A protein has these predicted regions:
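Catalytic cores of carbohydrate-active enzymes across secretory and cytosolic contexts
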Residues: 1-185
Length: 185
């Protein structure tokens, strides 16, 4: 039997379970199904994503005026395992600490989530992983730097050496830059 390549799968969102708000829609559903299938079949795949503090906004209807509005609530996931790993990413002239959590529930244990809401980061840095697609401009670039650069550094700290890097959409582009930086060092 041929050896399967080890794959690192980078994505901004994952839908593993509907009440775990780490996704917005189709991209997350695809990524979540991919991770679940890989885990079920024992494929050597690790997912890298973001531990969103508030996830994607929920649209609710104001009962009084019958108007829609977006609601954001802080979410806590007690099933995430602390890996004990923290990596650092330089963003806007400052070092941002990025904690690595293992998603270990709902039949998935091969997904690692990155979190900047940790002690030692200033308020702006803590909110980088606040809302999925909640900002544009510099904030979005910071989120993508955490996913890409932080993701590659997390893989190294976890001891996982992929044969293939899959970037689901352009959000993980900074992972490519980090891989180039490693080769040039």
């Amino acid at each position: 039997m041929r050896k399967l390549p080890k794959v690192a799968y980078f994505c901004m969102e994952y839908a593993i379970e509907s009440n775990v708000k780490l996704y917005a829609g189709g991209l997350g559903i695809l990524a979540g199904d991919y991770m679940k299938e890989a885990c079920d079949n024992g494929y050597p795949v690790i997912g890298i994503g973001i531990k969103w503090k508030q996830g994607y906004g929920e649209q609710l209807i104001d009962k009084e005026n019958c108007r829609p509005y977006d609601a954001y609530v802080n979410r806590y996931y007690d099933f995430l395992k602390d890996t004990g790993i923290t990596v650092t990413v330089r963003i806007n002239q400052r070092d941002v600490k990025v904690k690595v959590w293992q998603y270990d529930a709902h039949g998935v244990n091969n997904l690692y989530l990155l979190d900047t809401d940790v002690d030692g980061n200033d308020g702006d840095a803590r909110w980088i992983t606040g809302q999925l697609y909640g900002w544009f401009g510099e904030e979005r670039v910071a989120q993508e730097m955490v996913l890409g650069i932080g993701g590659v550094r997390a893989l190294r700290a976890l001891g996982f050496e992929p044969d293939v890097y899959h970037f689901n959409e352009g959000h993980a582009l900074f992972a490519g830059f980090e891989l180039i930086r490693e080769k040039m060092a």
